[in-house]
């Protein structure tokens, strides 16, 4: 019987220790060495140095050196490979359920990273279709996509694709292998990457599944044919390097005294029949948080059934002051004045996400001496079809314990400031914008650093690629989280295993890449669904006072550019009007402006939990949080790949051709 993922990891880690002991090799804990990455074993990054007398690997923020003779070193590496083969590799599993009118079709997968294979088991449910279509794509396109076809009468599969005209065509190279066929399900296998130009390459990030079925018609050749019953789903066939499972795959067990608290709207008022509404709900927690501290160990969205298409995202804030309970528009002038103290964000959720699990060593603190018991939920309703009379009582569900865990957990916002300064020109295929959390802000983190255990990337409709990278001493040392094919319709909290260690003085860069080819006007940075955002909510411990670390291109840079290059009134015009008054972004204008965004000074939000900025310290008196130079980066020998979005070069200008 094949071992489970957690068993395989236990065997591997135990085997590493056994091999080192057997060969009498010694381990030293040292700082990172600049050595080329050779291969990766779970959370062990193994390095082969220029000297043949040592083998190095790193785990977390530390590096280790195995000292020994060359012969023993070769034996150790060989045994490590054998051990990985024995353990069956690291396996990632996932599942989606497609609702197809007659039945629910369930697609499960097991991804074997070591063997570079993925097995799909497809369960037909109550009514097996005559023909099943399973498509894979980055962004949900139904043409130019990879397809697996299954014909029930013949019990046959076919590796196919849809061409630009949506026609289903058999692939010249058949890369799917039928492993099992039963009355109620089939199992197929494929390599993650086949090097076939008609096949989908499974990569870290979101994969969009297009599932279609037909009963009675077996000769359908166009995926747009109305006889198909269709559904779209989202999943991750491959997890990123910090998403690997560890020994503790299950969420931490809840304490016995856990209380369940629901904070939601009990107002009978319907959702307004306008496109964008932000509703605020202020509630008092139903237990004594003035004299006692509690830990939130789990949070779940509480979305009114049937309203999933209207509730776009939610945030919940702690209030510093005692505030009267209230429910209504966040922009209502009758909103309690003291609600301004509700600024400490403790959780965020977006459509498509599940619960937030805290690790066993940490919990989100609520209450304590001198603390108030009030929280505010902010709900963003997206109602483009202007539905009327929809009653909603969505909110958050908390799992709270009085048995305090070792660490207080915190949440921090990274990315771009919500501002029209961060706007995107029209007709751009891959317009990258970077939000910086520089060393001047992260120096306020605890001396021992923080451990990021979860990450939630968020953008709106034109976002296509989102990621946050970590830099130390100007050198990129890895990613916190990355989604190569982001979808605003399936957002999820990514648990990070192992945790990502961030030290004071590190720089975090959050990058969002937008596609505005279908838009004829500028897409402004802002709160509406048609505007754009770029955010990464990171969940971490131990808690710090840093809550917001975001940036924008400085207003002074923008005003100087639009004044000098486009003859606009740089002093009195609104930033949004300046963007709108550029009549033609072609003929090199977009390329020139892209360069301005990447070299101009920036405006920083480095904010405490009370909304106040940290004191700015710089030897350069000309700089401030409102006008500071962006970080500089250098190449390091252990990660030599330049990220073309975070560190642009002339090599990348093909994007503008």
From Swiss-Prot:
Cofactor: Cu(2+)
Matches recorded under Pfam families: Cu2_monoox_C, Cu2_monooxygen, DOMON
Annotated CDD domains: DOMON_DOH
Superkingdom to which the source organism belongs: Eukaryota
Summary of the knockout phenotype: Worms are viable and healthy, but have slightly reduced locomotion rates, and defects in the inhibition of pharyngeal pumping and egg laying in the absence of food.
Cofactor, how bound (note): Binds 2 copper ions per subunit.
Disulphide connectivity of cysteines: 280-330, 319-342, 437-549, 441-606, 512-534
Enzyme's top EC category: oxidoreductase
Spans through the membrane: 77-97
Keyword list, A-Z: Copper, Disulfide bond, Glycoprotein, Membrane, Metal-binding, Monooxygenase, Neurotransmitter biosynthesis, Oxidoreductase, Transmembrane, Transmembrane helix
Glycosylation sites: 104, 143, 555
Residues annotated for Cu(2+) B binding in this entry: 458, 460, 533
Gene3D superfamilies in alphabetical order: 2.60.120.230, Copper type II, ascorbate-dependent monooxygenase, N-terminal domain (2.60.120.310)
Function: Required for the conversion of tyramine to octopamine, a precursor of octapamine but probably itself a neurotransmitter. Involved in the regulation of egg laying, which is inhibited by tyramine. Due to its involvement in octopamine biosynthesis, also required for crtc-1-dependent regulation of AMPK-mediated longevity.
Name this polypeptide is given: Tyramine beta-hydroxylase
Origin species: Caenorhabditis elegans
């Amino acid at each position: 019987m094949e071992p489970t993922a957690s068993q395989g990891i236990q065997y591997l880690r135990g085997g590493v220790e056994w091999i080192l002991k057997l060969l009498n090799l010694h381990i030293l804990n040292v700082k990172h060495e600049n050595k080329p990455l050779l291969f990766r074993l779970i959370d062990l990054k193994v390095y082969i140095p220029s000297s043949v007398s040592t083998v190095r690997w790193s785990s977390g923020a530390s590096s280790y050196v195995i000292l020994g003779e060359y012969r023993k070193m070769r034996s150790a590496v060989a045994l490590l490979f054998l051990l990985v083969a024995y353990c069956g590799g690291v396996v990632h599993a996932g599942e989606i359920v497609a609702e197809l009118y007659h039945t629910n079709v369930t697609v499960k997968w097991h991804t074997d990273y070591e063997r570079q294979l993925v097995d799909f088991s497809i369960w037909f449910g109550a009514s097996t279709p005559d023909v099943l279509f399973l498509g894979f794509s980055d962004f949900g396109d139904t043409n130019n996509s990879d397809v697996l076809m299954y014909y029930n009468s013949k019990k046959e599969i076919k590796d196919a694709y849809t061409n630009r005209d949506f026609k289903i065509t058999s692939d010249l190279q058949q890369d799917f292998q039928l492993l099992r066929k039963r009355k109620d399900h089939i199992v197929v296998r494929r390599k993650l990457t086949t090097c076939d130009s008609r096949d989908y390459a499974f990569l870290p990030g979101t994969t969009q599944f297009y599932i279609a079925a037909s009963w009675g018609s077996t000769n359908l050749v166009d995926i747009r044919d109305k006889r198909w019953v269709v559904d779209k789903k989202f999943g991750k066939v491959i997890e990123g390097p910090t998403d690997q499972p560890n020994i503790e795959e299950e969420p931490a067990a809840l304490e016995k005294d856990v209380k369940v608290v629901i904070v939601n709207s009990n107002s009978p008022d319907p959702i307004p029949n306008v496109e964008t509404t932000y509703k605020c709900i202020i509630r008092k927690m139903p237990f004594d948080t003035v004299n006692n501290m509690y830990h939130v160990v789990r949070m779940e969205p509480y979305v009114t059934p049937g309203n999933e298409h209207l509730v776009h995202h939610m945030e919940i804030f702690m209030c510093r002051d005692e505030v009267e309970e209230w429910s209504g528009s966040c922009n209502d002038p009758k909103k309690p004045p003291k609600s301004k103290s509700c600024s400490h964000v403790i959780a965020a959720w977006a459509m498509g996400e599940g619960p937030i699990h805290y690790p066993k060593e940490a919990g989100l603190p609520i209450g304590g001496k001198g603390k108030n018991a009030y929280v505010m939920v902010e709900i963003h309703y997206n109602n483009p079809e202007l539905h009327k009379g929809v009653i909603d009582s969505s909110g958050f569900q908390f799992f709270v314990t009085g048995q305090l865990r070792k660490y207080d957990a915190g949440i921090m916002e990274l990315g771009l400031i919500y501002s029209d300064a961060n706007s995107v020109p029209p007709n751009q295929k891959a317009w990258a914008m970077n939000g910086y959390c520089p060393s001047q802000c992260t120096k306020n983190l605890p001396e021992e650093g923080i451990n990021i255990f979860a990450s939630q990337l968020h953008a709106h409709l034109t976002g296509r690629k989102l990621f946050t990278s970590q830099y130390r001493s100007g050198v990129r040392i890895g990613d916190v989280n990355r989604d190569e094919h982001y979808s605003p319709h399936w957002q999820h909290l990514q648990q990070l295993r192992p945790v990502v260690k961030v030290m004071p003085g590190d720089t975090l860069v959050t990058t969002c890449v937008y596609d505005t080819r279908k838009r004829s006007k500028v897409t402004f940075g802002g709160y509406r669904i048609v505007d754009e955002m770029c955010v990464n909510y990171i969940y971490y411990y131990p808690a710090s006072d840093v809550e917001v670390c975001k940036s924008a291109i400085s207003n002074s840079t923008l005003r100087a550019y639009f004044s000098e290059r486009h003859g606009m009134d740089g002093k009195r015009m609104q930033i949004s009007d300046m963007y709108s008054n550029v009549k033609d972004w072609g003929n090199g204008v977009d390329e020139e402006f892209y360069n301005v965004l990447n070299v101009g000074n920036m405006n920083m939000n480095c904010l405490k939990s009370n909304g106040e900025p940290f004191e700015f310290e710089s030897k350069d008196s000309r700089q401030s949080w409102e006008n500071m130079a962006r970080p500089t980066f250098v190449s390091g020998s252990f990660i030599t790949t330049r990220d073309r979005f975070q560190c642009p070069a002339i090599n990348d200008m093909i994007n503008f051709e």
